[in-house]
Amino acid sequence: MERGAERGPPPAPGGVALRGQPAGGCGPWEMRDRLGTGGFGNVCLYQHQDTGARVAIKSCRLELSVKNKDRWCHEIDIMKKLNHPNVVRACEVPEEMNFLVNDVPLLAMEYCSGGDLRKLLNKPENCCGLKESQILSLLSDIGSGIQYLHENRIIHRDLKPENIVLQDEGGKIIHKIIDLGYAKDLDQGSLCTSFVGTLQYLAPELFENKSYSVTVDYWSFGTMVFECIAGFRPFLHNLQPFTWHEKIKKKDPKHIFASEEMNGEVRFSTHLPQPHSICSLIVEPMESWLQLMLNWDPEQRGGGLDPETNSPKCFLLMDHILNLKIVHILNMTSAKIVSFLLHPEESLHFLQNRIESETGISTGNQELLLETGICLDPRKPASQCVIDGVRGWDSYMVYLFDKSKTVYDGPFASRSLSECVNYIVQDSKIQLPIPQLRKVWAEAVHYVIGLKEDYSRLFQGQRAAMLSLLRYNANLIKMKNNMVSASQQLKAKLEFFHQSIRLDLERYSDQMAYGISSEKMLKAWKEMEEKASHCAQAEDIGYLDEQIMALHTEIVELQKSPYARRQGEVMESLEQRAIDLYKQLKTRPPDHAYSDSTDMVKIIVQTVQSQDRVLKELFGHLSKLLGCKQKIIDLLPKIEVALNNIKEADNSEMQMQGKRQREIWHLLKIACTQSSSRSLVSSSLEGTASTPAATWVPQSSSEYAPHPLSSMATPGDGENFVDVIEENLNYLDRFSSMLQEAREEQNNSLTNFDWSWLK
């Protein structure tokens, strides 16, 4: 009995969309798109009209032989038992579609909206390979998926860009393996000798119909990764598989690339061809990994098993590459990127020493900014320069500034031309055959895109400098508000002090003739008044306030400047023109046709000129930003000095106020004591009024040298002093209220400040 019949679903009803996949649907499921067509089946996207749920349905489009029906059903069996984030997941077939088509059941799978890897590679901007972040993401995802399949004793056998789909999950692109129609379950036999699949990515042993193992997937995977790096397959990619097979099979085990010269000679290499987009620190381990994956000998391919872990060496090396901690630093003084492999627990200071050796900028003058404008924390390790899970120099950058410079000279020399591009720039009218011209123009497009991306990175560095400036400015505003608040509090205290001391001096003068007097105290109070006038100089911060306001105006103008926004529109337009030219060239038949490169060279020259212009504007604007930042740095210590002066004046005023209060209370104590003594003397005199000996007669010289007791206060004088003290206490209450209001005003100042100009 056929395996399809064992499943039991009824045959498809007549006229449903799945018969020939016309526009239509099954019940609430509407067909929205045709996703792909394989050797036997179609894959279409269906969407539920009510819930919006989407599912990819694979249906058979041909009448199959018994053998192929078994293979079809075998794929469904494999899909249903797999569960891995990098292998496309099988779903339950919707009830409305649960029927047979061409005597086999349907396969329902999760829908991945990002298209396949071939679609990504075919984009003209990727004609010389993908970005490093994309390559490393693919390496991680597909490597993990292949390991999972092999651990479950499944060989895919047909790995190719068309069978890798992309899905956006939470803003991160995930790669998934699809189409297990050719997969071989090793439980059916450890080796297999039959295969019909895509030849360009096929392992050599499959050409020769030899026995094979899991290492056939290594060859296909290595070929895919090479293509993602370089933009083309590694071995004579322009030739048909059966042609290059004979020329390549005697290659050295370490050869990972072969190209055909104009004279027909095949040139082998152990290195990746230029241009590509991967960092120099990754190139060597990546070449070593490709040498393992592209070994012609299936027994040696993958490097065998590691004796300690019993894992394939190729996957251990892959994990090593993916776990490298590399910090990429854009030197804004030279527009050059320097990369460093971080050591475990490396300190930031040690990294800065390495940066000094590479760039010549001393550690003391280095300012390392993240994209957010935050300066790296010297107390934290150097690993703060990288983000876990984020790989590739095109994804994350640290920006290096020289604090000893505020004027950055620019623009700098543009990136160097490749040998091929330089060839057509030197003579744009030279006629080249179309196949060769495609390669040259691909590198030209890569060069134009590179110029635009160089500008974009420098603009991001300028933006980091602006964000850093705004952080400094926010700190300046905070310190200014503290200074103004402290100045206002000091002014209020000094006003109170002047008013109270003037009143004290007036009242002291009023009672001095008949009350208590002290020349020493009077002199001290007058000195206090003069000292308070001197303290008032500390509250004068107008000159600083003027400088700060002028600087604020300058910063706002820089924010409003058109150079604060990206100026790459012209380069983007030129990039699109270069891409369009390349597209037109690819549509031309390659046979016996020649063409020149006049139009492409014009675009290259215009892009270089445009980049030169926008970089000149960028570095001019950057120099102004750094100039403003330096002004803030210069102002901050002046504000600190002003705050310290205000604090010292405040302390001095409080000490004088306390000293005067203590003296007043001392006077009050004396007055009260004298009042009590006088009352006792008066009572005693009244009791002995008839006794002459008890009568005290002042000496004749008292007019010039009064007896000490002559300054003793009368009861009425004591009451006057009590009034003075009460009045001083009233002033003290008023002063406390003024201080409280000043504190509340300070607390509200930051909240109510208009920050809109910072946006």
Curated annotation (Swiss-Prot):
Any GO CC annotation of this UniProt entry: nucleus
Molecular function in Gene Ontology: ATP binding; IkappaB kinase activity; protein heterodimerization activity; protein homodimerization activity; protein serine/threonine kinase activity
Major enzyme class: transferase
EC number: 2.7.11.10
PROSITE patterns membership: PROTEIN_KINASE_ATP (PS00107), PROTEIN_KINASE_DOM (PS50011), PROTEIN_KINASE_ST (PS00108)
Residue ranges of the region described as NEMO-binding: 753-758
Entry-linked Pfam families: IKBKB_SDD, IKKbetaNEMObind, Pkinase
CDD domains given in the database record: STKc_IKK_alpha, Ubl_IKKA_like
Residues engaged in binding ATP: 35-43, 58
Purpose: Phosphorylates inhibitors of NF-kappa-B thus leading to the dissociation of the inhibitor/NF-kappa-B complex and ultimately the degradation of the inhibitor. Phosphorylates 'Ser-10' of histone H3 at NF-kappa-B-regulated promoters during inflammatory responses triggered by cytokines.
Family statement drawn from the similarity comment of this UniProt entry: Belongs to the protein kinase superfamily. Ser/Thr protein kinase family. I-kappa-B kinase subfamily.
Name of the protein in its database record: Inhibitor of nuclear factor kappa-B kinase subunit alpha
Taxonomy of the source species: Eukaryota, Metazoa, Chordata, Craniata, Vertebrata
